[in-house]
Amino acid sequence: MTATATMPATMTAVQFAENPFEPRPEHKFTFGLWTVGWRGRDPFGFETRPALSPVAAVQLLAEVGAYGVNFHDNDLVPIDATAAERDRIVREFRRALDDTGLKVPMATTNLFSDPVFKDGAFTSNDARVRAYALQKTMRAMDLGKEFGAEVYVFWGGREGAEVDAGRNPIDAIKRFRDALNYLCEYSIDQGYNYKFALEAKPNEPRGDLYFPTTGHYLAFIETLDHPEMVGVNPEVAHEQMSGLVFHHGVAQALEAGKLFHIDLNDQKPGRYDQDLRFGSESIKASFFLVKLLEDSGYQGMRHFDAHAYRTEDMEGVKDFARGCMRNYLIFKEKARQFNEDPEIQGLLREIAVEDPELERLCRGYSREKAQQLSQRTFDREALARHRLQYERLDQLVIDLLLGVRGR
């Protein structure tokens, strides 16, 4: 049995079953090589941790109980690697995956680090850069499929501007569409069967990015040649940077059948992209996100796109990874308690007013229904007096989250 499929050596089967906060393969927890491999460098300071090889990252993630590992092409294979070096790296990485049982559910392309992408990749004003970005992405798709990746994420970190005079944003959108249409056809032609997932962000590293929110991408997807192949990869911190309620955007993606992947982390309001440990800051928001994912039956990966504080050593990186998964499972257990709490559920039933006849009239237009509805009378004052009790409901949620429910 593999490291991810077995219970800890000191834990009995009964204890394992009784511990709802222990990660298991069915939870589908994944991390990127760049997350546990982040060395702590920031704009004001150098690295605080040693480099972590891809093989060592796989071993670390297996040790903490993750299901899988994801990567950008150059997280695994350096951009200037020779063919022989690439083959050796791939061979060693595959051996590490086989030894640990970790999966590679998602892959992506780094189109933001190298100076060639300083003014964009697919949206660059330079046709040579746009062509190179396509070539690099096709090769990265080949690499991801070698390891069985099923989802391919696109984050346009340099697809934006600081100087709006430099590029017509309509041209940028058209270029981005052309690139995705091309890559969809490449995936079809190669038999890869990828699901593409587009990841939004309002700014950083560019001053402004062309697709700032998940909603922008949901609208854009419908203009593609193969919209059925393309969904979204919302990230907690990215949407919070825009001042949005993250789980509302996730709900829209779920309702549209477009939540192909999700990036979980946390964020202080009004800050740069912090990539904090999931659930470490926004406790109520994280709870409602997990509740939404679990209640909706979301079947995809729970990917943690975050990193340990730069104060930490490698043991602290393990603490970070364990904390991400543990916090998710704590919120999952709290969601179960919410759904089974008689007082909370009773209050929700009181708040909602069901009227089958009105539902019939309001769902699915017909001239007859419109005529019947236009003749109905409503007591506005009585409707306005309906008691909602949201203060009480919200306090019950707070009590539940703080562990004092029923006291």
Where are these regions (language model features)?
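Glycine/proline-rich, flexible active-site/cofactor-binding loop segments
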Residues: 144, 152-156, 170-204
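Short beta-strands and strand-loop turn motifs
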Residues: 69-73, 154-156, 198-201, 232-235, ...
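Histidine-acidic metal/acid-base catalytic patches
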Residues: 2-67, 78, 91, 98, ...
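Functionally constrained cores in energy, signaling, and assembly domains
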Residues: 130, 134-136, 201, 233, ...
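Structural motif corresponding to the early beta-alpha repeats
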Residues: 26, 35-37, 63-173
